[in-house]
Amino acid sequence: MKSFFLYLYVAFMFSCITALPLPVDNKRASSDSLDLKKKYAPDPPITHNVNIGIVFTDPESSEEAGRLITIDLYGTMVPKTVMTFCQYVDSVKDRLASRHSYSPERDFDKILPNGAIEGSSVSSSSIEETEMLAPKLPEENHSLIHDRPGRVSMIKDDKGLKFIIETSETPLEGESVVFGQVTAGLKDLMDKLANVKTDENGKPEQPITIGYISSQEHRIQHAKEAHEKYLQRLQDYQNGDLEKGITLKNYLYQGSQRKLEDAKYNQLHHPLPKIMLGISVLLLFYVLAKYRKRIFNRSSKIVSIRED
């Protein structure tokens, strides 16, 4: 009797362990680490939205996957950088719309140790040529900082300009200009894309490409007034009025529909019902094994009363 309950306990613990998600200690980034109540400084007026469909190899299933993210751009703060990124978006649109839309090249070159995702060159210009073109990073506005996951910034290297998407609060080394924020799909970005398999230099083992891209410009009628209101909200926040700040809660998903789909999935795939079903089956076998003589003896004692 005692040995049976010991086996039952071991089976229960094994089911619980296998049903739990994998630990995230070895992940570069994880949305589980986010404090969804934390207030960050307000964002500037939005001048553009960019939707990017990213195709990559899922680090858990090793199958090809696609995720859609939305990036808000802040043209009232860094107009030159935003203009350069929009030109890059247009070039990718043209590439995807052409007959030879398939491209074996990588649209994302590297995953940094802190989980930041480095895009390929925005311009193919050399560093000398880039010096004569907008944006000149040292002359741009640097008041936006890398203080939250989802920040999008532009850097310069010997290959020209590149954009980087942050997945943590760790500041970037070197000079960069923050020009946008991921405002939808941040969860997939942190949990999936930032944790793809890479070599020792951070290069993804399988190419990460852009399968879809679109952009929309928001024409602000009173841009100067909107920017001044933002500066006032920012000043209030810096003076201690945290109500003027924002959280990242709404940035994790692609919208309420996505949240609903996730909720339905979790209800259907939650491990607890499976665990309880397994325990119920074990208990049923136990009852049958213990009381089998009584159960089967009763059935054998049934006598026919039919008259000959």
UniProtKB/Swiss-Prot annotation:
Name of the molecule in the record: Peptidyl-prolyl cis-trans isomerase CYP8
Classification via InterPro entries: Cyclophilin-like_dom_sf, Cyclophilin-type_PPIase_dom
Keywords assigned: Isomerase, Rotamase
Top-rank lineage group of the source organism: Eukaryota
Pfam family membership, one: Pro_isomerase
Its job: PPIases accelerate the folding of proteins. It catalyzes the cis-trans isomerization of proline imidic peptide bonds in oligopeptides.
Gene Ontology annotations for the cellular component aspect, listed alphabetically: cytoplasm; endoplasmic reticulum; fungal-type vacuole
Biological processes annotated in GO: protein folding
PANTHER family membership: PEPTIDYL-PROLYL CIS-TRANS ISOMERASE (PTHR11071), PEPTIDYL-PROLYL CIS-TRANS ISOMERASE CPR4-RELATED (PTHR11071:SF568)
GO MF term set: cyclosporin A binding; peptidyl-prolyl cis-trans isomerase activity
Organism: Saccharomyces cerevisiae (strain ATCC 204508 / S288c)
Transmembrane segments: none
Domain PPIase cyclophilin-type residue range list: 56-215
EC number of this enzyme: 5.2.1.8
Statement: the UniProt record of this protein carries the keyword Isomerase: yes
Top class in the EC scheme: isomerase
Catalytic reactions on record: [protein]-peptidylproline (omega=180) = [protein]-peptidylproline (omega=0)
